[in-house]
Amino acid sequence: MAPNLRKSHPLLKMVNNSLIDLPTPPNISAWWNFGSLLGICLVTQILTGLLLAMHYTADTSLAFSSVAHTCRNVQYGWLIRNLHANGASLFFICIYLHIGRGFYYGSYLYKETWNTGVILLLTLMATAFVGYVLPWGQMSFWGATVITNLFSAFPYIGQTLVEWAWGGFSVDNPTLTRFFALHFLLPFMIAGLTLIHLTFLHESGSNNPLGIVSNCDKIPFHPYFSLKDFLGFALMLFLLTALALFTPTLLGDPENFTPANPLVTPPHIKPEWYFLFAYAILRSIPNKLGGVLALAASVLVLLLVPFLHKSKQRTMTFRPLSQTLFWILVSNLFILTWIGSQPVEDPFITIGQLASITYFTIILILFPIISSLENKILNY
């Protein structure tokens, strides 16, 4: 009998083991779709980004008008730009849901997979930040100024660090040029890290909603889950297209329709919606260095989650107390997102500080305590 090329060819064999004959738990729910959706987001962003880069000029005097030119004069340029801008939002929606799934179902116990995932999140955030600066609108410029200025909070080397990042004494042409270079490079770094992430995942196999070993029950990925993934792709691309065609500017900032002007500060500087929770945590601390450390901690706290797992059960499926706490944490993140979009005045300052304290308290203190309590209740 002739050898099956899919199983014998050195390249096809790898594809086969990752996408076709991959043993998969039979009971994984739609929450396990977001990994592949993130893959589609990445491919979409790289393709639309490449097409945009062909018409973009990374120069302070031309950047804004080159984006306007793309939207007005390039064939379907408006569509490519809208897909790229809204694709970023969908990318973050998917990654936040993906992280939430991992948190709820204890997937973080695959430590290597989880840690590479956190590095991927940080890289994605960096990519989105430098990308937001490129259209060179008011919010692009002032967002870049405010966030890069945070490096000056580092003792002794701070100011040197900021000027080194800027390439001068303010956000100017060198800054824009290097941000464009980084925005072009980082997505390929994300693609490489994704392969490492998947390599670690396929070492252990997928987790499942029950959090139990399912080796004896596993089924091939194709056709069962490839079809399920395809449905996810269709739904997400439908949502992206609807967003790009009907309300392309819904998630953007109106300030960015004005070209960057270093002499006029916008009344309220704020990042895109997907960074608002971290921005609220940054602003809730009156000290500059403290704020920067809290901002870093808001994401890096994810690295501690595997070490704070005290429950004898892996997932939260049968742990109602932890479930309640999880949804309180989700609500708290929504509150932080809302606070980040509000001006710095009285009720919002206090609410932001309370929500920031709650965020860290839930993750670092309450989850381990509640998990231990549940162990006791269940006589473990």
From Swiss-Prot:
Binds 2 heme b groups non-covalently. Heme b b566 binds at residues 98, 197. The chain crosses the membrane at residues 34-54, 78-99, 114-134, 179-199, 227-247, 289-309, 321-341, 348-368. InterPro entries: Cyt_b/b6_C, Cyt_b/b6_C_sf, Cyt_b/b6_N, Cytb/b6-like_sf, Cytochrome_b, Cytochrome_b_C_euk/bac, Cytochrome_b_N_euk/bac, Di-haem_cyt_TM. One of its GO terms (cellular component) is respiratory chain complex III. Disulfide bonds: none annotated. A ubiquinone binds at residue 202. Keywords: Electron transport, Heme, Iron, Membrane, Metal-binding, Mitochondrion, Mitochondrion inner membrane, Respiratory chain, Transmembrane, Transmembrane helix, Transport, Ubiquinone. Its cofactor is heme b. One of its GO terms (biological process) is mitochondrial electron transport, ubiquinol to cytochrome c. It comes from the Eukaryota. Heme 1 (or BL or b562) is low-potential and absorbs at about 562 nm, and heme 2 (or BH or b566) is high-potential and absorbs at about 566 nm. Component of the ubiquinol-cytochrome c reductase complex (complex III or cytochrome b-c1 complex) that is part of the mitochondrial respiratory chain. The b-c1 complex mediates electron transfer from ubiquinol to cytochrome c. Contributes to the generation of a proton gradient across the mitochondrial membrane that is then used for ATP synthesis. This is Cytochrome b. The gene is MT-CYB.
